[in-house]
Amino acid sequence: MGNVAGETRANVIPLHTNRSRVAARRRAGQRAESRQHPSLLSDPNDRASAEQIAAVVREIDEHRRAAGATTSSTEATPNDLAQLVAAVAGFLRQRLTGDYSVDEFGFDPHFNSAIVRPLLRFFFKSWFRVEVSGVENIPRDGAALVVANHAGVLPFDGLMLSVAVHDEHPAHRDLRLLAADMVFDLPVIGEAARKAGHTMACTTDAHRLLASGELTAVFPEGYKGLGKRFEDRYRLQRFGRGGFVSAALRTKAPIVPCSIIGSEEIYPMLTDVKLLARLFGLPYFPITPLFPLAGPVGLVPLPSKWRIAFGEPICTADYASTDADDPMVTFELTDQVRETIQQTLYRLLAGRRNIFFG
């Protein structure tokens, strides 16, 4: 067909030629590469780059394995706080389920090991830094009577003695303290003392404990030792009438003398206000450098350095059963125990350089 006069021919431009497709793909590839990590842009045929990447991967794996090992070792050895939390959780579970036992004196071993003893260990290890010697003189089993000096206004010495026996003795024995009646009349404290295994300081209870094969402790000085002035420190007071000796003789329990230094300095008593003591119904009302002037701060014991020494046991098996009622025998044995403790105190004091650092 011929062209019409005056008509202009239109040129058709192809939009999708192979060349344009290749150029578009190239531009898209460049944009994709610009969004990739630089480590992926290296030439895959470049051997050095591949080796470098492999080295980095190996290093990352090594760090990961090391971190995993550290985490495992950390989890295998929980810190003290984690142990305490776990102990409290276990304690609550057993208390709620009733999975614990109490003896005739009210001793609750579960309560003692989970609550009382962990609290006392802070004072034993960190505050008073107690050093123990002669613990091998305490029998591994069976009855025995530990006789110790008494001092310090508040009976921290008995509490530290119980921790020392349990933690330092190979058999980890529980020590049953014979305490003053007033302790068990106090709210909360009296009940806690019962649960910790302690009972009143009377011949009847002492005999029952020893007859049951329990390791028992007594402080024959009583309030006379606990409430003496600082100027009389480490001078033993009278040991009562020897009731503890009679109990040991009746049950054939060995007597283990025990000497404690450091307890006299925790509350240095300057004087005893007897009028206030009678007013409050107390055996004594102490005035120390910090109490009562410093208020509650004065109740914090000074961090003196403690030493507890157990002497060789005095055998009672060779005594006759009638000797327990013989005043001369009980007096002689009481005096022997007292003198042993006193001489050991002098020896320990002679080796001490400083009250607070030992």
Swiss-Prot record:
CDD domains: LPLAT_MGAT-like (cd07987)
Compositional bias annotation for Basic residues: 18-29
Cellular component per GO, a single term: plasma membrane
Chain residue ranges for the region called Disordered: 1-47
GO molecular function terms noted in the UniProt entry: acyltransferase activity
Signal peptide bounds: none
Family: To M.leprae ML2427.
Protein's UniProt name: Uncharacterized protein Rv0502
